[in-house]
Design a protein with these regions (language model features):
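Active-site-proximal beta-alpha core segment in soluble small-molecule metabolic enzymes
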Residues: 89-284, 291, 305-310, 318, ...
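Generic beta-strand/beta-sheet core signal
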Residues: 99, 126, 148, 174, ...
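Conserved, well-structured core domains of diverse proteins
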Residues: 1-59, 560, 568, 579-581, ...
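Short glycine/threonine-rich loop-to-helix capping motif typified by GTGT followed
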Residues: 253-261, 292-310, 340-354
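Short helix/loop capping segments that flank catalytic or ligand/cofactor-binding pockets
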Residues: 106-108, 133-134, 156, 181-182, ...
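Low-complexity, highly charged intrinsically disordered N-terminal segments
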Residues: 27-104
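Short, glycine-/Ser/Thr-/acidic-enriched flexible segments
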Residues: 31, 39, 69, 103-105, ...
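Charged (often Lys/Glu-rich) extended helix/loop segments that serve as interaction or gating elements
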Residues: 314, 320-641
Length: 641
């Protein structure tokens, strides 16, 4: 019964039923399990996968990638729109594309293209490099390749070549200069690719990316620029080549009302252009389908106040309503949502290496007549504190502490005395917080004290590499321990990474009602790794991660699960080693080895080191090129000499 209650408490604390979208749950053993097909009928314990990694000496941190979640999420996306089209008897069609920038990892795109083929799923690119990579994939014959972003001549020439390859290319115009080059190039080669116009809507998105939309957006054509573009296309005799109207009101749209406003406006733009004799076929609604990171289903920036089906229903209904009122045939709807497709399929796993203790053991502190009077007074405060005087006595302890530290700074107090003071102050704070909790009164001073005293869990990863959005824009990701969920978590803590940067600390966590300043965690056991999972990290994080402190891309396991819930296949992808990271920064292996060799040679000539030691160090140095930059599971000191 206790285990069951602890599991129920864990479900409530970590909110997995809210943000898991059917892909994650907690087993009766108190472990996190994955449901790759979106239901509980098929499940695999994440600890089993980590056992596989341990047996093969695959170090944490690592990403667990589940292509079947990607496949399921793609099916959900297309089903939502198809269901809406059936319900409203929509006469147009659907074409979804994946924005390359959301996750450019080859392993991910490989799985995406394979899963997307049955949906005629396409790709969206925004740069020459992305287009170059995307063209190497053979997509479904009906799949679109939408080319956004600012373009130079080489970008445009490559797009024209793609049309010769049989690709359904649409070049979306960001400015009239781009359009003029396309028109000129089309004259030279004797054909034109499909053209799209990106509209700068008045309607805005919501959430963290609201500023990327509206009339102040850096992207899209104003109404005046739109009219100029239409005139240029008509003058060039390319009216039949204008195929798409495109807009985008930002990533992670949190409010469905904003979606509706934009849909109405964009549908009007589409209809007006169509009625002017242009051969429009596609209305590209951009991306922005929100991911409910905190499980609250609200308009909070880490959530979304609508479901995928509601989003699709509103889009289809409003496009049809506007087109009917304009006597315009309904277009093929194009969706570029990538976050909602990619986020769920990847889990970052790492292990806790250390928990920082606050203070020491009060039982080990001995205060006698030989100690400074302030130390004796402080111990007296600790011993005499009660529920009636805890506020006053706590204030006294702070005053004593400040006086003692001032004396230390002036050289009148020993380091041992300072250490005793720290232990006593720590225990006084604990005692005061205990009485404050019993009082039922909420004093701001003690609420802040409680926040400041959360434990610090040192985890073996880099925030800047693996979840950079949590640092750069304070994006929230679900975080929870992967085991021991049938035990009560006795501590609250923040998570520190192993970079030498004070910003490498995670102190904001998801909660259905608010944002938590700490996370419920267990005391790690010395003989068992304590693994923590960071969920919904499959969108943008790998693309935006940086090599701060020379921590690079982490190890990966690509996991396939059988319909019976067995581990069917696990593919290993090695993370970046030290040598690869240094080469990115323009170091060469030869240059580094030469630097070591020259210094060791000088030491050898000076008689400070033996040839055997030189040889041993050089052998050690060569091995470092293939070293994983993160902390090893068990480190063994190698003795030189």
């Amino acid at each position: 019964m206790a285990n069951t209650q602890n599991i129920q408490d864990a479900l409530q604390k970590y909110g997995i039923d809210g943000w898991g979208a059917g892909y994650f749950g907690v087993s009766s053993r108190g472990t996190v399990e994955v449901h790759p097909f979106g239901n509980e009928e098929v499940s695999v314990d994440l600890s089993r996968i980590l056992e596989h990694a341990s047996e093969r000496r695959i170090q944490t941190p690592l990403i667990l990638r589940f292509p079947q979640i990607l496949d399921t999420q793609l099916a959900r996306l297309h089903s939502a729109f198809r269901n809406a089209m059936d319900e409203f008897k929509y006469a147009g069609d659907l074409r979804c594309v994946f924005p390359y920038k959301v996750n450019q990892r080859k392993e991910y795109i490989d799985a995406l293209v394979k899963s997307g083929r049955k949906h005629a799923y396409g790709l969206e690119v925004g740069t020459k490099a992305e287009l170059f990579a995307a063209l190497s994939y053979e997509l479904h014959p009906d799949a679109l390749m939408v080319c956004n972003g600012f373009k130079d001549s080489r970008y445009i020439e490559l797009a024209f070549s793609a049309k010769k390859m049989g690709k359904n290319i649409v070049l979306v115009i960001e400015g009239t200069d781009e359009l003029k080059f396309i028109i000129e190039y089309a004259k030279q080669v004797g054909f034109c690719v499909d053209i799209g116009l990106r509209a700068k809507l008045y309607s805005k998105g919501s959430g963290l990316w609201e500023k990327s939309s509206g009339t102040e957006s850096k992207f899209g054509l104003s109404s005046v620029e739109m009219m100029e573009a239409l005139w240029l296309i008509e003058e060039a005799g390319l009216k039949s080549s204008l195929a798409m109207v495109h807009y985008h009101i930002g990533s992670q749209i949190t409010e469905i009302k904003r979606v509706k406003n934009a849909m109405k406006e964009a549908s009007r733009v589409y209809s007006k252009i169509y009625k002017n004799g242009f051969n429009l076929r596609y209305l590209n609604i951009g991306g922005g389908i929100g991911v409910d990171y905190d499980g609250s289903k609200t308009s909070f920036y880490a959530s979304a106040n609508y479901t995928l089906q509601e989003f699709a229903n509103d889009v289809v209904y409003l496009v049809q309503e506007v087109c009917q009122s304009e006597n315009c045939p309904p277009p093929t709807i194009v969706s570029e949502s990538g976050r909602a497709v990619a986020a769920y399929h990847a889990v970052l796993v790492t292990d806790v290496r250390e928990v920082e203790k606050m203070g020491g053991d009060i039982q080990e502190v001995i205060i006698d007549e030989g100690d400074h009077k302030l130390l004796r007074d402080m111990m007296n405060v600790y011993q005499q504190m009660s529920s009636k005087n805890y506020v006053e006595f706590y204030h006294d302890s702070i005053e004593y502490r400040d006086e003692l530290f001032t004396l230390f700074g002036l050289g009148y107090l020993s380091l041992e005395a300072r250490a005793k003071a720290e232990v006593i102050v720590n225990e006084i704070a604990n005692k005061a917080l205990h009485y404050h909790a019993l009082s039922g009164v909420q004093l701001e001073e003690f609420e802040e004290l409680a926040k400041s005293r959360t434990s610090k869990y040192l985890a073996n990863f880099s925030i800047f590499q693996s979840i950079p959005d949590s640092w750069s824009i304070e994006q929230l990701f679900p975080v929870m321990p992967l085991t021991r969920l049938n035990e009560r978590a006795s501590k609250t803590g923040v998570i520190m990474d192993i970079t030498c940067d004070s910003d490498g600390c995670l102190d904001k966590f998801v909660d259905k009602r608010d944002v938590k300043n700490s996370l419920e965690l267990h005391v790690p056991q010395s003989d068992t790794p304590y693994h923590i999972g960071f969920f919904l990290v499959g969108a943008y994080q790998e693309a935006l991660g940086n090599n701060h402190n020379l921590f690079g891309a982490v190890n990966e396991l690509i996991v396939q699960v059988s319909p019976q819930g067995q581990l069917e296949n696990i593919e290993e992808v090695k993370g970046e080693d030290v040598g690869e990271l240094l080469r990115v920064m323009n170091y060469t292996d030869e240059g580094i080895l030469s630097g070591f060799a020259q210094q060791l040679s000088a030491r050898l000539k000076a008689g400070k080191i033996t040839q055997a030691e030189v040889d041993q160090i050089m052998q050690q140095v060569k091995g470092y090129f293939s070293e994983y930059p993160y902390l090893l599971v068990k480190s063994r000191l190698e003795i030189i000499g």
